[in-house]
Regions:
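Hydrophobic beta-strand-centered segment that forms part of the acyl-chain substrate-binding groove
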Residues: 66-112
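Beta-strand-rich interaction surfaces with strong enrichment in secreted/lumenal proteins
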Residues: 6, 48, 98-101
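Catalytic strand-loop segment that frames the active site of acyl-thioester-processing enzymes
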Residues: 10-57
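HotDog/MaoC-like acyl-thioester-processing domains
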Residues: 102-154
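Short aromatic-glycine motifs in intrinsically disordered, low-complexity regions
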Residues: 1-12, 84
Length: 154
């Protein structure tokens, strides 16, 4: 099921921030991503001393912590068989994130997300990002919806 979920992520390789999903239940998802040292956003942020932009940290947290879980819950709760012409499109509706540590190029991060609620198509999760030592890099609340979009091209 985890690989099936990853196949539904609507991102191409340069903006897909999910390497692995190690746990996936109705209430929790745990996944990781290793930031590539040659990622496009490091060249200018900050030149000569690159760090991962907060918007990228937020995006990693959203992709693993909200989108993966949302797709899982929708596929689990419906009898819909999504294919290339009937894809799922995630829409982030709100975030409230606090940052505690820098994330450097080449660093592996783990995202842990716990569902707060999923009703009427809206998912809300408490999401934490941890570094390789288990220290919290960022944490916050994420909300979003996932819609079916016919003919969405990847």
């Amino acid at each position: 099921m985890k690989n099936h979920i990853l196949n539904h992520l609507p991102y191409k390789s340069s903006f897909r921030f999910v390497d692995n999903i190690s746990r996936l239940t109705e209430d929790e998802v745990i996944g990781d991503f290793t930031l590539k040292e040659d990622a496009f956003f490091y060249e200018d942020h900050f030149a000569g001393n690159p760090i991962t932009p907060g918007v990228i940290i937020t995006e990693i947290m959203a992709q693993i912590g909200l989108v993966v879980m949302g797709i899982f819950l929708i596929l689990k709760d419906t009898e819909l068989n999504f294919d290339e012409d009937n894809d799922l499109f995630p829409l982030l509706t709100s975030t409230d994130v606090s940052f505690f540590k820098m994330v450097l190029p080449g660093q592996k991060v783990t995202v842990v997300s716990k569902k707060q609620y999923f009703r009427f198509g809206k998912l809300k999760c408490y999401v934490e990002m941890l570094d390789s030592t288990g220290e919290v890099v960022a944490k916050g609340m994420f909300s979003g919806i996932i819609k079916q979009v016919d003919g969405l091209k990847k």
